[in-house]
From Swiss-Prot:
GO biological process terms held by the UniProt record: glycine decarboxylation via glycine cleavage system
Keyword Oxidoreductase: yes
Catalytic reaction equation(s): N(6)-[(R)-lipoyl]-L-lysyl-[glycine-cleavage complex H protein] + glycine + H(+) = N(6)-[(R)-S(8)-aminomethyldihydrolipoyl]-L-lysyl-[glycine-cleavage complex H protein] + CO2
Residues found modified as N6-(pyridoxal phosphate)lysine: 273
Task of the protein: The glycine cleavage system catalyzes the degradation of glycine. The P protein binds the alpha-amino group of glycine through its pyridoxal phosphate cofactor; CO(2) is released and the remaining methylamine moiety is then transferred to the lipoamide cofactor of the H protein.
Family statement: Belongs to the GcvP family. C-terminal subunit subfamily.
PANTHER family: GLYCINE DEHYDROGENASE (DECARBOXYLATING), MITOCHONDRIAL, GLYCINE DEHYDROGENASE, DECARBOXYLATING
NCBIfam families the UniProt entry points to: PRK04366.1
Protein name (record): Probable glycine dehydrogenase (decarboxylating) subunit 2
InterPro entries reported in the protein's UniProt record: GcvPB, GDC-P_C, GDC-P_N, GDC_P, PyrdxlP-dep_Trfase, PyrdxlP-dep_Trfase_major, PyrdxlP-dep_Trfase_small
SUPFAM superfamilies per record: PLP-dependent transferases
GO molecular function, one term: pyridoxal phosphate binding
GO cellular component, one term: glycine cleavage complex
Protein species of origin: Pyrococcus abyssi (strain GE5 / Orsay)
């Protein structure tokens, strides 16, 4: 049984002692203070913790022992693709020639960086079947917003101002309707059929002259491939709408089929999912957006282009109908470096094998867990990269909820799957093992879930009160949402007001 380290660790500010240092700056040759205009000088010293280097190392080492990540063990968050991040990615992203360049440098001095971005775009075009990419968006949701703004600009440019409706399946990621709403669209939900895929009749009834587009994930969030995608594309395009691809689940079809060949007009990808760059904790990520030829003039500026005649890469602002910038400068460059490293190391054959093993792992786990008391598998049996179980029978028969199952999994030293999503599955457990998990790890995960099932029916309180072996047990999610304390300054202010007692 797993037991996580538990330290009564203070905040680093609480370790601070006046005069204690971990780094000494060289003595300035001249009096720097004289050169700084008075209006730019601070009125008070920086409020930084004064600690030694050994104290800093020990502090963060202890905190890391109370954490769990992809290097700790299986991390099967559904639709998150928490795969192993190869360390060569980090080595190249941290290389001085990458780390020490500046986005304001003359483009003649950063030809290597521009080439990295241009080469990455060529890979992404080939993988998706798109004709042009922007690498600017900083995350998947940022990419979604970029995509729907391009859809909006396209229709407005054609004078079709009535197209104010965005169609979104009921199995979609929550950010899809949010991104559409942020762009000013009215969101129309399309129900799923008994197979867990888009209901074509409902789609036919929903499209009209007001339809701007359909946002679709394929495979969808149930891990099921939308096998009627060609018909879906025909329906949307016949109505004058555009088809948008949410690339969250690209890992399930990588190297097998391309969104552009299915009829999609716009795609966003998650480099921090499919292409092994680190994610979680708020970033950094990258959500490049690709489009077909007829939409390229709406992409954010600048793009990275290559002048073959003069053999140089340059920042291209000649994008006549651009929606403008969606992020300052040129995107999260170090993430782009990691993704290109992964692509070059894997190669085309390796990428195809990624999806094959990811699909194999998900279906192996599904087959081994199927039939376990308390869990049921809705919709089709054959899945792509992930599988969604329902713990509704367990809740009904024992009172043990999906949340309890997820918390109990932590006691086995395993990360919980995504829970309560997609919303169309009650008491959902959404499991995506990825291709970097071994058969032994899959077997252990299934055994843990079977053990939890046994406990739910024989000693449910053990599951309901879990976790028992972690550094932190159940947090107050409501308090964290209503009164977030995310900075030292916020904590001090609330402490002074007596609103926190720790």
């Amino acid at each position: 049984m797993y037991r996580q380290a538990k330290w009564d660790e203070p905040l680093i500010f609480e370790l601070s002692r006046p005069g204690r240092v971990g780094y000494t700056l060289p003595k300035p040759i001249e009096d720097v203070d004289v050169e700084i205009p008075e209006k730019l000088k601070r009125k008070s010293p920086l409020n930084l913790p004064e600690v030694s280097e050994p104290e800093v190392v020990k502090h963060y080492t202890r905190l890391s022992e109370m954490n769990y990540g992809v290097d700790s063990g299986i991390y099967p968050l559904g639709s998150c693709t928490m795969k192993y991040n190869p360390k060569i990615n980090e080595e190249l992203a941290g290389h001085p020639k990458v780390a020490y360049i500046h986005p304001y440098q003359d483009e003649r001095t950063v030809q290597g960086a521009l080439r990295i971005m241009w080469e990455l775009e060529q890979w992404l075009k080939e993988i998706t079947g798109m004709d042009r990419f922007t690498l600017q968006p900083a995350a998947g949701a940022n990419g979604e917003f970029t995509g729907v703004m391009i859809i909006k600009a396209y229709h407005l440019d054609r004078g079709e101002t009535q197209r104010n409706e965005m169609l979104v399946p009921d199995s979609a990621h929550g950010t899809n309707p949010a991104s559409a709403a942020m762009a000013g669209f009215k969101v129309i939900e399309i129900p799923s059929n008994e197979n867990g895929t888009v209901d074509l009749e409902a789609l036919e009834n929903a499209v009209s002259e007001r339809t701007a587009g359909l946002m679709l994930t394929n495979p969808n969030t149930l891990g099921i491939f939308e096998d009627e995608i060609e018909e879906i594309a025909k329906i949307v395009h016949k109505a004058g709408g555009l088809l948008y691809y949410d690339g969250a689940n690209l890992n399930g079809i990588l190297g097998k089929v391309r969104p552009g060949d299915m009829g999609f007009d716009i795609v966003h990808l998650n480099l921090h999912k499919t292409f092994s760059t680190p994610h979680g904790g708020g970033g950094p990520g990258a959500g490049p957006v690709g489009v077909k030829e007829f939409l390229k003039d709406y992409l954010p500026v600048p793009l990275v282009s290559y002048d073959e005649e003069n053999d140089r890469y340059y920042l291209d602002y000649d994008v006549p109908k651009s929606i403008g910038k969606v992020k300052e400068l040129f995107g999260n460059f170090a993430v782009l470096v990691r993704a290109l490293t992964y692509l070059k190391v894997m190669g085309k054959d390796g990428l195809r094998e990624v999806s094959e093993v990811a699909v194999l792992n998900a279906n192996y786990l599904a087959r081994k867990l199927k039939g376990t008391r308390g869990y049921e598998l809705p919709h089709k049996e054959l899945r792509k990269h992930e599988v969604v179980f329902s713990a509704e029978p367990m809740k009904r028969e024992t009172g043990v909820r999906t949340l309890d199952v997820a918390k109990r999994l932590l006691d086995f030293g395993m990360h919980a799957p995504t829970i309560y999503f997609p919303l169309i599955v009650h008491e959902a457990l959404m499991i995506e093992p990825t291709e970097t998990v071994s058969k032994e790890e899959l077997d252990a995960y299934v055994e843990a879930m079977k053990k939890i099932s046994e406990e739910a029916y024989t000693n449910p309180e053990v599951v309901k009160s879990a976790p028992h072996n972690t550094a932190v047990r159940r947090v107050d999610d409501v308090l964290a949402s209503k009164k977030p304390i995310i900075t030292w300054k916020m904590y001090k202010e609330l402490k002074e007001k007596g609103e926190v007692d720790y």
